[in-house]
Swiss-Prot record:
Protein name (Swiss-Prot/TrEMBL): DNA primase
Gene3D superfamilies membership: 3.40.1360.10, DNA primase, catalytic core, N-terminal domain (3.90.980.10), DNAb Helicase, Chain A (1.10.860.10), Zinc finger, CHC2-type domain (3.90.580.10)
GO annotation, cellular component aspect: cytoplasm; DNA-directed RNA polymerase complex; primosome complex
Organism: Clostridium acetobutylicum (strain ATCC 824 / DSM 792 / JCM 1419 / IAM 19013 / LMG 5710 / NBRC 13948 / NRRL B-527 / VKM B-1787 / 2291 / W)
Known catalytic reactions: ssDNA + n NTP = ssDNA/pppN(pN)n-1 hybrid + (n-1) diphosphate
Function in brief: RNA polymerase that catalyzes the synthesis of short RNA molecules used as primers for DNA polymerase during DNA replication.
Zinc finger (CHC2-type) stretch: 41-65
EC number: 2.7.7.101
Pfam families reported for this sequence: DnaB_bind, DNAG_N, Toprim_2, Zn_ribbon_DnaG
Annotated binding of Mg(2+) 1, by residue: E261, D305
Cofactor note: Binds 1 zinc ion per monomer. Binds two Mg(2+) per subunit.
Family note: Belongs to the DnaG primase family.
Keyword field: DNA replication, DNA-binding, DNA-directed RNA polymerase, Magnesium, Metal-binding, Nucleotidyltransferase, Primosome, Transcription, Transferase, Zinc, Zinc-finger
HAMAP family: DNA_primase_DnaG (MF_00974)
């Protein structure tokens, strides 16, 4: 968890001494084309170079996928570093020393973070010692095949069935109730304070560096909730960590990671010597987890539970991992077992065979859909073919041929009929707004920005450059009204411009960049800096109003699409009465669109 801010002049010095052409060339083979350099984009698959690097401006831009940024952004995105990590990496290259403890440019709250880590370590030791004194808790792990060595390695423990045991212990170590509340170890309710975890086996949660950042606890009886996790704290953010990654990193995991759902799945596989395993801890893999994973691997094998929730999570996880650029395969475990059960019953070699035979997402979706098909029921077969046609219509011609033959073999429907169905679907979807439009002159895809994205950038550029216009924009639109999360962050940073901040643009953009701690925001601020807006005294407010209208229009159209989808789902189930309120809502949205 980064808690540091580096001064703008240090950041600028790091950028000045690291030529972007040199840094990009470590990853991309560049060729000089006029004043710029070009190569194959590292952020998306392409055969014709659309990635351009400007040595004069010290920025890069891909005309195929829209990625853009400076030398720091490039390091953040290609290495999945945070902003501070990227600056430190580049600083090391040019022998600039940045001292975590003494540098005056860092925020002064490191001591508070260190105390949170110390409290968690102390609590983890306490829980671990408790395990030996409670036979029921220890039996829980032993019954699941977890040996003493693994219990010690993962720091597994037990929280006693007592309201204030941990509280008393931690206070004896010198920690205050307020500090323990901030760490999420105790709860305050109706002026009373008590232990958060009681009568539960405990799983310490580590970050990728091996620091204890939180805990998960499972009940030993039928009480609810079955699992209880630490709340979010300054060092523990849900959806930004992967359980077991610290162990996986230590074991030379290679280029492939296996993702499972829960603590026990991860722990069991590690015990059986399968070390390239992490757990997403819940059914929803996040973009932040995918970014963290990208530092260590380019291939992912998903092994979620076989139940409905697990299958749904597999599909959601696939979309996020695909967006992050992973090569993805999916395991189907026989008999509906989870990874923990399977490896305990069948051993390491059997599980590794499942990994070797993992299938692509297309095969997974086709096979999953086929499970519910009744080949004797014509309607069931037709629905299956239509559903699958939507899945494969975006594949390249060779892949499409392969899957059409598979579907034809499964269903007995002629290949030509399936081709015709896909062609019809593609024609119907031709009216949809596409991000990628075909450039007939060059035979490559060019990225087309949406109107609302451009409008948000223009508004932010105006806010940065013109203080008087900033006030007008603030009165018309807030950060929450913006669509892109990175733009919301930049909007709020602009509102916090310091009074003594220089009025020149370079200082303002430097101030913002030093506070953009993620790749998307860092990339966006470079794009905003590149925007040029022609202004006259007469058209400023009209321009701003037009930009805001574009944003509102997009949000309303997205709401309309969502409601239309809900109406369609209800109608397919025959629930026509339930659609009445939704139809009224859609009419209201349409009226708002008409009045924009």
């Amino acid at each position: 968890m980064e808690c540091l801010i580096i001064a703008e002049d240090i950041i600028q010095k790091v950028k000045d001494l690291n030529d972007i052409v040199d840094i990009v060339s470590e990853k991309v083979k560049l060729k000089r084309t006029g004043r710029n350099y070009s190569g194959l984009c590292p952020f998306h698959h392409e055969k014709t170079p659309s990635f351009s690097v400007s040595q004069d401006k010290q920025i890069y831009k891909c005309f195929g996928c829209g990625e853009a940024g400076n030398v720091i952004t490039f390091v953040m995105k290609t290495k999945n570093f945070s902003f501070v990590e990227a600056v430190k990496y580049l600083a090391d290259k040019v022998n600039i020393t940045i001292d975590d403890n003494k540098d005056k440019y860092y925020a002064k709250n490191k001591e508070k973070y260190d105390k949170l880590y110390s409290m968690n370590v102390e609590a983890a030791r306490y829980f671990f010692r408790n395990l030996d004194s409670n036979s029921k808790a220890k039996k829980y792990f032993l019954d699941r095949g977890i040996n003493q060595k693994t219990m010690r390695r993962f720091g597994l423990g037990y929280a006693k069935d007592d309201w204030r045991q941990l509280l008393s212990f931690m206070k004896s170590k010198g920690y205050t109730e307020l500090e323990l509340i901030e760490a999420g170890l105790i709860v305050q309710k109706n002026k009373a304070v008590y232990d958060r975890f009681r009568n539960r086996v405990i799983f310490p949660v580590f970050d990728y560096k091996g620091k204890v950042i939180g805990f998960g606890g499972r009940v030993l009886d039928d009480s609810k909730p079955k699992y209880l996790n630490s709340p979010e704290t300054k060092i523990f953010k849900k959806g930004t960590n992967l359980y077991g990654l610290n162990f996986a990193v230590k074991n030379n995991i290679g280029d492939t990671i296996i993702i499972v759902e829960g603590y026990m799945d991860c722990i069991s596989l590690h015990q059986y010597g399968i070390n390239n395993v992490v757990a997403s801890l819940g059914t929803a893999l996040t973009k932040d987890q995918a970014k963290l994973l990208k530092r260590y691997a380019s291939k992912v094998v998903i092994s979620y539970d076989a139940d409905t929730a697990g299958q749904a999570a597999t599909l959601r996880g696939f979309d996020i991992l695909r967006e992050a650029g992973f090569d993805i395969k999916i395991i189907k475990i026989p008999d509906g077992k989870d990874p923990d059960e399977f490896v305990r019953k069948n051993g390491k070699e059997a599980f590794m065979r499942l990994v070797e035979n993992a299938v692509s997402i297309i095969d997974y979706r086709i096979n999953r859909a086929f499970e519910n098909v009744n080949l004797k029921d014509s309607e069931s077969v037709i629905k299956y073919v239509k559903d699958i046609s939507e899945i494969i219509e975006e594949l390249d011609p060779v892949e499409k041929d392969v899957y059409i033959k598979k579907i034809s073999d499964k269903t007995g429907i002629r290949e030509q009929a399936i081709y015709d169905l896909i062609s019809t679907d593609i024609q119907k979807s031709g009216n949809n707004i596409e991000k990628m439009n075909k450039n007939s002159n060059y035979g490559q895809n060019l990225y087309v920005e949406s109107a609302h994205v451009k409008s948000e950038r223009y508004l932010l550029r105006l806010m940065i450059e013109h203080k008087d216009i900033r006030s007008y924009i603030e009165s018309k639109i807030s950060a929450d009204d913006l669509i892109m999360e990175s733009h919301k962050k930049i909007y709020n940073i602009i509102l916090n411009f310091e009074d003594n901040l220089s009025s020149d643009l370079k200082s303002k953009f430097g101030f913002i960049e030093s506070r953009c701690d993620d790749g998307e925001s860092s990339s966006e601020i470079v794009k905003i800096e590149e925007q040029n807006i022609m202004l006259s005294e007469n058209n400023v407010k009209d321009l701003v109003d037009d930009f805001i209208t574009n944003i509102k229009k997009f949000r309303l159209e997205e709401s309309k699409k969502k409601i239309m989808s809900e109406i369609k789902g209800l109608e397919e189930k025959g629930l026509f009465d339930e659609t009445i309120e939704l139809i009224k809502r859609m009419e209201e949205i349409q009226n708002q669109l008409d009045n924009l």
